[in-house]
């Protein structure tokens, strides 16, 4: 584009103006105050341009070998004399009269006599000629007069609150519409005057300030509005239908005016607190806990929805907190005392989940955790301490633990603190009766691992073992469990009564993982003995002694047991039939020839046999203990024998013989008849072979009463455990003192508690220390009896 001529440049400069704001395009007015539109590049008062003296084309310069230096240019400066336009007579008064008429028409909801474009231009013209400040004040005055009158019209109205609120809403909506219309006309005022004067409010803010001012001057209107809003909200809480749109509009009015917090929120929260305080007391008395918790959950949902629909979001947190405080915090203890035990007993997982969720909202989970701990301990104590139900104790504990696990997972969301509470409480309750739970858990496992559990699959048995292992973890006296478990395992292995060898080994593997190899060393040794015994028996059958010396018609299998692995069995004398004595002697000869230097001792009380018997109604096989077999074989030579005759012939210890005869003559399978009849065997009783015995099965198991655990046997097992504990305590004391040489009583007791894995009382430890002093392993410091010295 070529440079403009001097004339065109001058024209552009003369068209410039001091105003920095542009106005909408419009036609030229009659008073000639409107200027032509400005050119965007001619706003400067001084326009400079230059001309080159040698206008040689650029192409010619490029063709030269050496470029010439730039030639100096001549600069022309043109100064402009701007003519200031003059205002027509009464311009300001006429323009304001026009605008005032329009503003009043807007407030009176009448038709405006002028088109909006001309009104906009009128405001623009006033601003252009520095009359914007006065115009702002005039508009503010008009607005104030109207707003004051509008709000005063609401004073003294004795209408229904809902009608009154509708009128307030109408007043507010009219105000908003009117202020927006006025702002659209006076937009130039907002864009220029307000921006240039930071202390001046926009027209909208000015209107809000006036509305707020005159609302405060009409306190009756504000107070009735707040009262009406609170009344409507309370009605809605009481399940009455209300106009939520009206509520929303009026609350937005309070927010827009900046009086929401002071005028509405404060009384609203106070009223909410009073409402729910009364409701909480009423419902707590009338409802059970599940219903009450559902009600609280519903109320919290309602209030949250209320905040979404019409209450300002800023109120949500204090509102929900108020509801939680009045419906939950105030009633935590009552809820727990009144309903927690019922919910736990009924396994009400959904209601417990609701309780946990609600309690977490008010930081009351610690109270819930304590209630859970108390419940577990009290309920478990009833199970453990009821001696009449010892038979069902373990199964009851398993069922109780299973239900707690379900509640923990489904209701308490696997909360770690709650899980630890259940574990700690279970450990407490299961050790309330010293040693007995450990013994019963071992017995329970014996029942499950014993052959005869029909309908139990390998998977089900494995699941039971896992669950029992959980109880085992809680036991403090694991040595008691080991003693009884080992005794029962021995019977299962020796009598061939294990339901599954794989299950037996699986359980030992679990115990090994739980307690270490030292705990299961003897149990594993028992299995090794059984496996080795099978090999020894096979080798014996192939030996020359067996082929040439064994009596015919008898098959015999021997378990060779390592004394250190197996329980201690008291020796019991018995006169065996000649055939069995021969068999034992031949086997002993074979074994000692193979394993020289060893010693065999027969435990006849553990033997069992299968006898073939001829009855008048058919042949039968009788599965009996060795003692029962010895007694029955006497009747091959006599039809009737007295108690004394049998005792002399067998040499069985008196109590054991009475139990044996009782099982043969007084039990379900009566292969002997006792005279006189009765449940107990007395001196002088006579026994004869029951030739008329009949049974549907060919092989019959005669319950061996003497093989059932007696009170004496239980006591003996427990005493052995206590004796072993004393040895362990003595060894621990000597081990510690040998390392420390000198130690105080308090520190010694502390270290013993750390090292010993079974429960022990300080008084018992003191007795063991005294015993070691008597045996000269330790001595007291002469100057201080509380100090012990180790004696090498």
From Swiss-Prot:
<dbReference type="InterPro" id="IPR001373">
    <property type="entry name" value="Cullin_N"/>
</dbReference>
<dbReference type="GO" id="GO:0006281">
    <property type="term" value="P:DNA repair"/>
</dbReference>
<dbReference type="GO" id="GO:0031625">
    <property type="term" value="F:ubiquitin protein ligase binding"/>
</dbReference>
<dbReference type="InterPro" id="IPR016159">
    <property type="entry name" value="Cullin_repeat-like_dom_sf"/>
</dbReference>
<dbReference type="InterPro" id="IPR016157">
    <property type="entry name" value="Cullin_CS"/>
</dbReference>
<keyword id="KW-0938">Abscisic acid signaling pathway</keyword>
<dbReference type="GO" id="GO:0048366">
    <property type="term" value="P:leaf development"/>
</dbReference>
<comment type="similarity">
    <text>Belongs to the cullin family.</text>
</comment>
<comment type="pathway">
    <text>Protein modification; protein ubiquitination.</text>
</comment>
<keyword id="KW-1017">Isopeptide bond</keyword>
<feature type="region of interest" description="Disordered">
    <location>
        <begin position="1"/>
        <end position="43"/>
    </location>
</feature>
<keyword id="KW-0539">Nucleus</keyword>
<feature type="compositionally biased region" description="Low complexity">
    <location>
        <begin position="11"/>
        <end position="23"/>
    </location>
</feature>
<dbReference type="InterPro" id="IPR019559">
    <property type="entry name" value="Cullin_neddylation_domain"/>
</dbReference>
<keyword id="KW-0833">Ubl conjugation pathway</keyword>
<dbReference type="GO" id="GO:0009908">
    <property type="term" value="P:flower development"/>
</dbReference>
<dbReference type="GO" id="GO:0048367">
    <property type="term" value="P:shoot system development"/>
</dbReference>
<dbReference type="GO" id="GO:0010154">
    <property type="term" value="P:fruit development"/>
</dbReference>
<dbReference type="GO" id="GO:0000151">
    <property type="term" value="C:ubiquitin ligase complex"/>
</dbReference>
<dbReference type="GO" id="GO:0010100">
    <property type="term" value="P:negative regulation of photomorphogenesis"/>
</dbReference>
<dbReference type="Pfam" id="PF00888">
    <property type="entry name" value="Cullin"/>
</dbReference>
<dbReference type="GO" id="GO:0048825">
    <property type="term" value="P:cotyledon development"/>
</dbReference>
<dbReference type="GO" id="GO:0009640">
    <property type="term" value="P:photomorphogenesis"/>
</dbReference>
<comment type="function">
    <text>Component of the CUL4-RBX1-CDD (COP10-DDB1a-DET1) E3 ubiquitin-protein ligase complex which mediates the ubiquitination and subsequent proteasomal degradation of target proteins. Participates in the CDD complex to light-mediated control of development. May repress photomorphogenesis through enhancing COP1 E3 ubiquitin-protein ligase activity. Acts together with the CUL4-DDB1-COP1-SPA E3 ubiquitin-protein ligase complexes in the repression of photomorphogenesis and flowering time.</text>
</comment>
<dbReference type="GO" id="GO:0080008">
    <property type="term" value="C:Cul4-RING E3 ubiquitin ligase complex"/>
</dbReference>
<dbReference type="InterPro" id="IPR036388">
    <property type="entry name" value="WH-like_DNA-bd_sf"/>
</dbReference>
<dbReference type="GO" id="GO:0010182">
    <property type="term" value="P:sugar mediated signaling pathway"/>
</dbReference>
<dbReference type="GO" id="GO:0006511">
    <property type="term" value="P:ubiquitin-dependent protein catabolic process"/>
</dbReference>
<dbReference type="GO" id="GO:0048575">
    <property type="term" value="P:short-day photoperiodism, flowering"/>
</dbReference>
<dbReference type="Pfam" id="PF10557">
    <property type="entry name" value="Cullin_Nedd8"/>
</dbReference>
<keyword id="KW-0832">Ubl conjugation</keyword>
<dbReference type="InterPro" id="IPR036317">
    <property type="entry name" value="Cullin_homology_sf"/>
</dbReference>
<feature type="cross-link" description="Glycyl lysine isopeptide (Lys-Gly) (interchain with G-Cter in NEDD8)">
    <location>
        <position position="738"/>
    </location>
</feature>
<feature type="compositionally biased region" description="Polar residues">
    <location>
        <begin position="1"/>
        <end position="10"/>
    </location>
</feature>
<feature type="domain" description="Cullin neddylation">
    <location>
        <begin position="724"/>
        <end position="784"/>
    </location>
</feature>
<dbReference type="GO" id="GO:0005634">
    <property type="term" value="C:nucleus"/>
</dbReference>
<comment type="subunit">
    <text>Interacts with COP10, CSN3, CSN4, CSN5, CSN8, DDB1A, DDB1B, DDB2, DET1 and RBX1.</text>
</comment>
<protein>
    <recommendedName>
        <fullName>Cullin-4</fullName>
    </recommendedName>
</protein>
<dbReference type="GO" id="GO:0009755">
    <property type="term" value="P:hormone-mediated signaling pathway"/>
</dbReference>
<dbReference type="GO" id="GO:0009738">
    <property type="term" value="P:abscisic acid-activated signaling pathway"/>
</dbReference>
<dbReference type="InterPro" id="IPR016158">
    <property type="entry name" value="Cullin_homology"/>
</dbReference>
<dbReference type="InterPro" id="IPR045093">
    <property type="entry name" value="Cullin"/>
</dbReference>
